[in-house]
Amino acid sequence: MTALASFTFVRHMDGLRYHFERDGEHHGRPAYRRADGNVWCVWSPTDGWHCEIADGLVTAHPLYSHADEPDPPATVWRSFKSDRSYLYDLRPLDPEA
């Protein structure tokens, strides 16, 4: 199976979109960098699939997944930073689009 090349997180409350592109590997699985370069979506043995910022602080996890799939799961994710929390859909991008 081929790893995702890119995907978008779409925020539930207002449709805000964050685009991620594949950029190397992390712990033997694909790593994805947000287009603005501030956030990574990666897999680790301890946290499974998650998003983290540059200092390694975990900022999001999938809600309805074991987080051990070969690619980030296309499901609802919850972000959390300081006192804010949002729900996002991870939507794989169609390479033909």
Model segments located where?
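Interface elements of modular peptide-recognition networks comprising either
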Residues: 1-97
